[in-house]
């Protein structure tokens, strides 16, 4: 019996962040000891989004709809999701957040922002400890 490996296509999504948010991501990496494993902000952002897809809850009163004047998003990172995860993220966006966020990229920004504000914990951290 032959076993065929399924081609798992990755989708890259570029997200613009405020510099302070990127710094908070880097602080999170250091506080959780992930810097010892050379984990980068993009990888942590990807983990945050993947965890959120499994439990998609955000405080809608704190959501940012789009770009705010006088608040440049100067940092950029890439979130990499499997095609199925990307489809699921888009389904959640259309069903729950399309009126609160101008795009999926802005939804991802809100996911990261609320994770950091709430001092969330990643499910994958158990593997590193």
Roles of regions detected by a PLM:
Residues 11-53:
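Extended, hydrophobic interaction surfaces within ordered domains
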Residues 27, 36, 89-92, 96, ...:
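Intrinsically disordered, low-complexity N-terminal regions enriched in serine/proline/glycine
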Residues 1-22, 29-30, 58-94:
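Short Lys/Arg-rich basic patches
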Residues 8, 35, 98:
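Active-site oxyanion-binding pockets that recognize sulfate/phosphate
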Residues 30-32, 94-96, 125, 129:
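Short intrinsically disordered coil segments
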Residues 36-63, 100-129:
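Short, basic amphipathic alpha-helical segments that act as recognition/interaction helices
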């Amino acid at each position: 019996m032959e076993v065929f490996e399924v081609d798992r296509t990755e989708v890259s999504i570029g997200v613009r962040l405020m510099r302070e948010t990127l710094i908070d991501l880097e602080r999170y990496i250091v506080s959780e000891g992930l810097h010892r494993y050379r984990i980068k902000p993009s990888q942590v952002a990807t983990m945050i989004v993947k965890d959120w897809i499994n439990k998609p809850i955000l405080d809608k009163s704190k959501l940012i709809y789009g770009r705010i004047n006088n608040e440049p998003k100067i940092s950029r990172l890439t979130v990499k999701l499997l095609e199925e995860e990307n489809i699921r993220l888009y389904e959640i966006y259309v069903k729950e957040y399309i009126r609160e966020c101008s795009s999926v990229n802005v939804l991802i920004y809100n996911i990261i922002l609320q994770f950091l504000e709430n001092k969330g914990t990643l499910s994958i951290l158990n593997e590193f400890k």
